């Protein structure tokens, strides 16, 4: 059959002008196995309609759905030294960067922009997990700090969507330095009395969790997101005990008071706009009947009196 498959079929296809069908037209839900057409999934912000499972979404797509009418102005990220340690593991770090940049068309994993949500001016910063696992390095650290400086200069709130596996090992201590540096920028934001809201997406771990991802005024998590410092497998091997079901999930963290609410991506924009109106004392906007989906997964934590 090989000669038919490898020779005859391509010849017939070329004669008839038949085009090959792309492999990514249908996306499989990892939880239910449901197949969803890629255009439908993109229109639904990469949330599976039936199960509500949140797929990974690119930084550009997230900003497009988050800002009013999909309109925003990108904030230019500062330039940094590339591969200062001349790091090499299985391949050179500089080569890894070139591969990701060519594949995704971005310099690193942070995209920041100016725009409005329900008419409110805002700065939004998004980590793209597709670029080296959203790892925190010099470039991403500088980009986050630049976003805070821009928000302070514009006197507007900042919303950060965190998605990261932690510090970038290829940059060593220079990567770890970004943890205190971003913390200082957050303190400047607080001194300016401007809201800083963090949206924790799947996954948010490592040094990112240990720094700017857990220093917001309000912490919102997407459903089913894994949030923690070390991964559950590492913790279980260290303490040699079975972990509770759903350990480090956004719902588990909500139940134990580590996040303020769990909100569906489909309701994120309306929820954040409502919070900012309260924090900034903006007039309340008339709330349309469809502002929240019927099966909204918004949950607000209840703090017990000490």
UniProtKB/Swiss-Prot annotation:
Residues 287-306 are annotated as: Disordered. Component of the acetyl coenzyme A carboxylase (ACC) complex. Biotin carboxylase (BC) catalyzes the carboxylation of biotin on its carrier protein (BCCP) and then the CO(2) group is transferred by the transcarboxylase to acetyl-CoA to form malonyl-CoA. One of its GO terms (molecular function) is carboxyl- or carbamoyltransferase activity. It catalyses: N(6)-carboxybiotinyl-L-lysyl-[protein] + acetyl-CoA = N(6)-biotinyl-L-lysyl-[protein] + malonyl-CoA. This is Acetyl-coenzyme A carboxylase carboxyl transferase subunit beta. Belongs to the AccD/PCCB family. Acetyl-CoA carboxylase is a heterohexamer composed of biotin carboxyl carrier protein (AccB), biotin carboxylase (AccC) and two subunits each of ACCase subunit alpha (AccA) and ACCase subunit beta (AccD). Keywords: ATP-binding, Cytoplasm, Fatty acid biosynthesis, Fatty acid metabolism, Lipid biosynthesis, Lipid metabolism, Nucleotide-binding, Transferase. Pathway: Lipid metabolism; malonyl-CoA biosynthesis; malonyl-CoA from acetyl-CoA: step 1/1. Residues 294-306 have a biased composition (Polar residues). It is an enzyme of class 2 (transferase). It is found in: Cytoplasm. GO terms for biological process: fatty acid biosynthetic process; malonyl-CoA biosynthetic process. One of its GO terms (cellular component) is acetate CoA-transferase complex. InterPro entries: AcCoA_carboxyl_beta (IPR034733), Acetyl_CoA_COase_Trfase_b_su (IPR000438), ClpP/crotonase-like_dom_sf (IPR029045), COA_CT_N (IPR011762). Residues 25-294 form the CoA carboxyltransferase N-terminal domain. Its EC number is 2.1.3.15.
């Amino acid at each position: 059959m090989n000669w038919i498959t490898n020779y005859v079929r391509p010849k017939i296809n070329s004669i008839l002008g038949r085009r090959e069908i792309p492999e990514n037209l249908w996306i499989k839900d990892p939880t239910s196995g449901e197949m969803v057409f890629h255009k439908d999934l993109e229109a639904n912000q990469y949330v599976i309609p039936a199960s509500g499972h949140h797929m990974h979404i690119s930084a550009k797509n997230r900003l497009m759905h988050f800002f009013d009418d999909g309109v925003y102005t990108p904030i230019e990220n500062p330039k940094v030294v590339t591969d200062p340690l001349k790091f090499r593991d299985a391949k050179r770090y500089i080569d890894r960067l070139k591969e990701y940049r060519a594949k995704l068309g971005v310099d690193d994993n942070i995209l920041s922009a100016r725009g409005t949500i329900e008419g409110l001016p805002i700065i939004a910063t998004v980590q793209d997990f597709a670029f080296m696992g959203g790892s925190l390095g010099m470039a991403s650290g500088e980009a986050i700090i630049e976003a805070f400086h821009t928000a302070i200069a514009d006197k507007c709130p900042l919303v950060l969507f965190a998605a990261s596996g932690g510090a970038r090992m290829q940059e060593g201590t220079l990567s770890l330095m970004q943890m205190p540096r971003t913390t200082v920028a957050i303190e400047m934001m607080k001194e300016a009395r401007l809201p800083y809201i963090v949206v924790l997406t799947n996954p948010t771990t490592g040094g990112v969790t240990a720094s700017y991802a857990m220093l917001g005024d309000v912490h919102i998590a997407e459903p089913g997101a894994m949030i923690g410092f070390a991964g559950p497998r590492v913790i279980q091997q260290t303490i040699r005990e079975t972990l509770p079901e759903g350990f480090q999930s956004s719902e588990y963290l909500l139940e134990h008071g580590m996040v303020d609410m769990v909100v569906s991506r489909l309701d994120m924009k309306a929820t954040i706009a409502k919070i900012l109106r309260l924090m900034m004392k903006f007039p309340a906007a008339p709330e349309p009947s469809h502002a929240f989906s019927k099966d909204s997964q918004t949950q607000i934590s209840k703090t017990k009196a000490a």
